[in-house]
Amino acid sequence: MFSMKQNCWFIRKVVIWRAVASIAWSVLLLPITTAVFVLLSRFSLFHPIQWISDCTNLLTASSTIFSLMVLCAVVLITGFFNLEFYTLVPSIPCSRVALLGTVLHPLQCVHSLVYSSMGMLVMWCASVIISGRYSTLGTPCMQNESGDVLTCLNEYHLFLLLAGAFMGYSHSFLGVVKNMYYVSFQPIQQYKYPQFKGCLPMLLKCSVIQSLYSTRNFAALYFFFGYVPRAWISSTLNLPIDSSLQPLDSLTGLLDFSLLYHLSISGTFLYFTWYLTVLIFRIYATEAYSFPVQSTFSEDAERCLPKVVGEKSTLVMKFLALQDLALLSQHSPSRRQEVFSLSQPGGHPHNWNAISGECLCLLRDLTQRLVAHQDAVASNGRVKSQSASSDTRSASSSSSVLSGMEDVPETPRPTVPLRTPGSVFKSSVGGMHSSLTAPFTPDVDSPFCSPAIRRLVGQQDPQSPWFGTVQSPHIMRRGPKLWSASTESQSNGSPPASPAIAPSPPAANKKPSFLAQWLQNRKEQVKSFLAKRVLIVYLFNKLPEASSQALFADSQAHIWALQGLSHLVAASFSEDQFGVVQTTLPSILSSLVVLLEAVDRHFKLPHASSKPARTVCSMGDSTYKTLRFALRAALKTAIYKITTTFGEHLNAVNISTEHRKRLQQFLEFKE
């Protein structure tokens, strides 16, 4: 979320001004879209001269100018919502009840109410522009009894207003369901105008399709429930209903070609106005920004790339810094020299240490998340049979991953991993039933857990070495060995690690009280009762691909880190005059191989390698669904980039035997 409350120089001087520029362009393009709407609303095939004359007079009318001012206010509010609600990491609910909770969130309810109101305003402007029978809410009518001319309710105008409210709510609802507030970065950088020109046909197509869907749905809804708002408006405003006209909540009233045509083009105009604002904001927000690598003045050090790339609070600045790092490593030899340079005085590679340290921190964070997810799934017995029938490398993958984690040195400064969506991770540590693993595996104590999983898990012996917070032998193996701690610490130059503390034996079981036992029995009865309800199981079951998509929701940052590291390491083979990259080359290679092992193991899990289904044209960006495939491709490309550049020189790098064997496969182009 690009919050305006963040006190950051990048938000004040870059993001807000980009949002203002996008809103300005949306307002400037509004007269053009309004003119096209006027031409379509007054279209007459058999009277072209009168059609053009009427459109010209209507465009210069005071009612049209006032409607245009109202539409400008709607665009301003839409631009503010874009700035306030858009995010770089999509929120992916892992169950239907989580999605329902997101839709019913109070902030989302306010958002839906505002968009419904704006939809009514846009439809009011459209009805004023179309004029004729849609112009006002009250229309003169003749009563049969007295013959007096009275003001009756204009149901056509009411129909358009209610349709605008329905379309506004649909837009807000689809913004949550289809992640319309997710801003993704294009893999190929383009200037703003070619990017806008290329997206314009898709924008028009999505507007037309969504308008037709909304017209169909609203017509069906009004057919069944249209009498309710009509009677309420009639009694509230004291506007009688003209009995001589056919009501619109009937088949005869709805099968009006002129009404459906004007509703469709008005809906297209509404969606196109909003989608255009969204598109321009995305183009401006994802525009590349060049950060200086180093600065002569100390007050500008906070704005340099080595400092900005480790930013935690302002996510948009961190993403643009990683994007700049990826572009720098590929297309800017002069800036690469600044990365490889040494500080004066002192001669320390501070720039390279900060950049490489943050990139390695991102990769290690992703590796730890993948290992935790795999251990949680394996502990529940989901993939044990699959792992047994896999290839021979799966038996040594865990040891390879863990040995790689031991080989990778920790960065000297404290780092915080990149935040993932709140529906996936709420804490960085936890056991089997913690919030870290909860979205990926069902709770064994849950009433919705199958009996087969309970039998596979079983009860843990309190005297077992796996009792407590330890969940798998992988985590135990990552602990220091008592007989090798001193030798390893001497060879690594680090102080000896303290041995793992054995879990204390549990206290003697006390007999629960009668009240506690009664409450526990009632709780089990409620669980068993709810577990038999089909609707409850349907709402609380995990969505098959959501866990994998949520795990890689922020992988765009990792892709840029992989690209930046690999190209910088490859360029250092001929450009690094001081050899600053050679000191961290073993850590980089180990981190890449460890991450590759974890990614390969993840793609062996159910639903992890399945391709997402193609969706109907929508403004909701679905590129996050394929980020795991893009990450795997970027990871293998990064390793190939390094191995093909260094070749047999990698044999002199101090890495483990398992990692050397895996790199040999890349050298032989067998991956």
From Swiss-Prot:
GO terms for cellular component: nuclear membrane; nuclear pore transmembrane ring. It comes from the Eukaryota. It is a multi-pass membrane protein. It is found in: Nucleus, Nuclear pore complex; Nucleus membrane. GO terms for biological process: mRNA transport; nuclear pore organization; protein transport. Residues 378-420, 480-508 are annotated as: Disordered. Residues 1-19, 86-109, 178-220, 282-671 are cytoplasmic. The keyword tRNA processing does not apply. GO terms for molecular function: protein-macromolecule adaptor activity. Belongs to the NDC1 family. This is Nucleoporin NDC1. The gene is ndc1.
